Amino acid sequence: MIWRSEHIWIELIVGSRKISNFCWAFLLFLGSLGFVLVGTSSYLGKNLISLVSSQQIHFFPQGLVMSFYGIAGLFISSYLWCTISWNVGSGYDRFDRKEGIVCIFRWGFPGKNRRIFLRFRMKDIQSIRIEVKEGIYARRVLYMEIKGQGAIPLTRSDDNLTLREIEQKAAELAYFLRVPIEVF
């Protein structure tokens, strides 16, 4: 979501609370839970899942391997659920022409550096840079080039913006900030 006025541009950034992350975390949890149940039922010799008979799967090596993959999947699923609940990567970009300040805020993982807050003067912005890599894994990222700081990404590489959308966004932001656009 973008909110703009004559002097201020605020863009809210969606972090890890995307529908795709919810779907992946849910599917991974169900799949790995199924693997753990099949491995456990082969160990106990009881049918915990009615789809597979425990006599068809021997505990060593199939049941053991399925249990291992199930436990690994549960760990990965719990990691995804934690990033969703902490909303890692969300935040905002705030460009204030009146005060001449740019603020970039993102939520990180819990700990000492949970809040990532960057603040720059607008006159330190050299350019808005578009990086485009075409091919099977196309990647289009928008950067803000800062004197002495390097390039700071403004969009995620997994946003999957079309070339037209990223060009439009770069042009609007460069016009608002009154800086040139570079394309790589």
UniProtKB/Swiss-Prot annotation:
It holds the Pfam family Ycf4. The gene is ycf4. The chain crosses the membrane at residues 19-39, 64-84. The lineage of its organism: Eukaryota, Viridiplantae, Streptophyta, Embryophyta, Tracheophyta. One of its GO terms (biological process) is photosynthesis. PANTHER family: PHOTOSYSTEM I ASSEMBLY PROTEIN YCF4, PTHR33288. GO terms for cellular component: chloroplast thylakoid membrane; photosystem I. It is a multi-pass membrane protein. Keywords: Chloroplast, Membrane, Photosynthesis, Plastid, Thylakoid, Transmembrane, Transmembrane helix. This is Photosystem I assembly protein Ycf4. It comes from Oenothera elata subsp. hookeri (Hooker's evening primrose). Seems to be required for the assembly of the photosystem I complex. Its main location: plastid.
